[in-house]
UniProtKB/Swiss-Prot annotation:
Residues carrying Phosphoserine: S17, S65
Domain-level remarks: The PID domain (phosphotyrosine interaction domain) of isoform a and isoform c is capable of binding residues 212-224 of pkc-3.
Protein's organism: Caenorhabditis elegans
Effect of F221L: Prevents binding to pkc-3
Designated name of the protein: Numb-related protein 1
Length: 593
């Protein structure tokens, strides 16, 4: 057992010793073959003994920690080859940026400060002032990535949103410059497409300098200019080719009247293979443009062709008149669709007379009906009795003729009637005897005599002639009592038994008291207190009531044909009539009709 066990231990120890010998030989070979280089910083350490294996393991870990990672080793290699070390210029350092801009892969990590409106399209002072104002604002900068290409500038948010902050075409950019106060600052001025204002966008580069960003944008300017020149040249060439093709095309008569039996066109097509692809669809893209340019800007590859024109198009051009609106739509149309035979629709609708037919001739107009409502002119309201006896007799409507245009107090009174006042003592004598009919004045034909009323008539006729010739109306002021007396006078004249109201006789012995003028030949009888008027002028009706004190009946109520003695007819005594009741009853009757 002991021998076998000893053999086991001895074999194990020998194996361990062999391994240690191999590791020592490997380390010695590495140290001998190792040469100095910039890739790894190796610290020369003394070779540990066999007894210090733990120390050797710790040193190996230290060596591994001192070695630079691969990315840092690449950057250190670039640092050794940088222009600052080698003495090269900045343009050589930024030379790869131009190729990256052409391929559309140039990008920089920046902090987007925002945009502010400026009032000039170029200038370093303008950009520096905009950057200063953006830094002074309390807006938090946004971490973003600036992509620079020949088409435009794009700013993409680097946060969670990954949204597009700015998408600016390079044609709209007018100026760009770095900030001379800070190395990381950069700004460019562009025209805003929506508001048409000059806006300045500010950036702060995180890893690069503002000069490098400005150089990349300058490369984008040059690439855009080259594309524009190339596009203009190709467009000019295409225009020349299209003009040549239009001149060498077949005449119009051959187009409208083709000869299908002629095979000359087939021979020409076989001789010139280029004519077989005369369709413009095959020539719509430029053949010499590279795939990269087509991928970056596919719209610029398409040729803007001018349509070919021939003289037949000029023949077909017909000038069309300028469209005009219907003039009837601009005419003001009334609400009434009246027949064409009417004079005008506006005459049928007037203020306060929408349901009346009013003629244009002022001489044929009927007098307007008096009402208690609002009137167009300030006229006194009639408050007297139109039918004082309650017999249903209305005063006749007197129409004005062309000769009586002036408004005076004697309008409607026939001044041709000759008036002789009846003596009062005779009337009283007949009344005492009971013969009331004899006391009533009778019509007698007398010779024309010149009395005070005739003089008054001549005076008023002269006034009318003067007013008609001068075209002015004599202003008269009439009181309510005067109007009431005139109306009572017309009623009493219409109640005359011997003279009808429609055609009054030329002469009459009926006494007429005018509204104004000289007094009559004799004084009138005294008036009762309850029938006296405020102005003190008596009426005809009051004189008749004084004459018939016994019966108080009106002569118009006597039946002249049936009874010779009117005193035998019993009539109820006349009751006083309220003028307001008469007016309201008349309005009610008119409304029912």
């Amino acid at each position: 057992m002991s021998a076998s066990q000893g053999n086991v231990f001895t074999r194990g120890l020998s194996r361990i010793s062999r391994r240690k010998k191999k590791t020592k030989s490997i380390q010695n070979s590495l140290v001998s073959e190792q040469q100095p280089s910039f890739d790894a910083a190796i610290v020369p350490m003394p070779i540990p003994n066999d007894k210090s294996s733990i120390f050797s393991k710790g040193m190996d870990r230290l060596r591994r920690s001192l070695r630079l990672p691969k990315k840092r080793r690449d950057r250190s290699h670039d640092r050794h080859l940088s222009p600052d070390v080698t003495g090269g210029s900045k343009t050589e350092q930024w030379q790869p940026d131009e190729g990256a801009v052409r391929t559309g892969t140039c990008c920089f990590n920046v902090k987007y400060l925002g945009s502010v409106e400026v009032y000039e399209s170029r200038g370093m002072q303008v950009c520096e002032g905009a950057l200063k104002s953006l830094k002074a604002s309390r807006r938090k900068p946004v971490k973003a990535v600036l992509y620079v290409s020949g088409d435009g500038l794009r700013v993409v948010d680097q946060g969670n949103s990954r949204g597009l902050l700015v998408d600016q075409t390079i044609e709209k950019v007018s100026f760009c410059a770095p900030d001379r106060q800070t190395d990381k600052g950069f700004a460019y001025i562009c025209r805003d497409g929506a508001s048409r204002r000059w806006m300045c966008h500010g950036f702060l580069a995180t890893k690069e300098t503002g000069e490098r960003l400005s150089h990349a944008v300058g490369c984008a300017f040059s690439i855009c200019l080259e594309k524009k020149k190339r596009r203009d040249e190709e467009t000019a060439q295409v225009n020349v080719q299209s003009a040549q093709e239009s001149t060498s095309s077949t005449p119009p008569k051959d187009i409208f009247h083709p000869n299908w039996e002629d095979n000359t066109s087939e021979g020409t097509s076989t001789q010139n293979p280029s004519n077989s692809r005369s369709n413009l669809a095959y020539q719509s893209f430029r053949k010499h443009v590279s795939i990269e340019d087509r991928y970056l800007d596919p719209q610029s590859v398409i040729i803007n062709e001018v349509p070919a024109s021939n003289h037949m198009d000029e023949i077909r051009r017909i000038s069309k008149p300028r469209p005009t609106g219907n003039p009837a739509l601009f005419l003001r149309q009334g609400s009434l669709r009246a027949p064409p035979d009417m004079p005008s629709s506006s005459d049928q609708f007037k203020r306060n007379m929408s349901l009346r037919t009013v003629s244009n001739n002022p001489t044929e107009r009927s007098p307007e009906k008096k009402s208690f409502g609002t009137q167009l002119y300030n006229e006194p309201i009639y408050e007297g009795d139109e039918d004082p006896l309650g017999l249903g007799i209305t005063p006749p409507v007197v129409t004005k003729t062309s000769g009586s245009l002036s408004n005076n107090g004697l309008d409607g009174i026939n001044l041709n009637w000759k008036s002789i006042p009846a003596p009062v003592h005779q009337m009283q004598q007949h009344n005492a005897n009971g013969d009331f009919v004899a006391a009533w004045p009778q019509n007698t034909i007398e010779k024309p005599t010149v009395g005070p009323l005739d003089k008054l008539q001549k005076q008023f006729e002269d006034i009318k002639l003067i007013s008609i010739s001068s075209g002015e109306n004599t202003p008269t002021t009439r009181s309510k009592a005067d109007e009431w007396l005139d109306d009572v006078l017309r009623v009493s004249m219409s109640m005359s038994p011997t003279s009808p109201s429609s055609d009054p006789p030329s002469t009459s012995s009926y006494s007429v008291l005018p509204k104004s003028g000289p007094p009559p030949a004799h004084a009138p009888p005294p008036l009762p207190v309850r029938q006296a008027v405020s102005n003190g002028s008596p009426s005809i009706y009051q004189q008749q009531l004084q004459q018939a004190n016994s019966t108080r009946n009106s002569p118009a109520g006597i039946n002249w044909n049936s009874s010779p003695n009117p005193m035998k007819i019993s009539q109820p005594p006349a009751k006083p009539v309220d003028p307001f009741d008469v007016q309201w009853s008349r309005l009610a009757v008119n409304n029912t009709h």
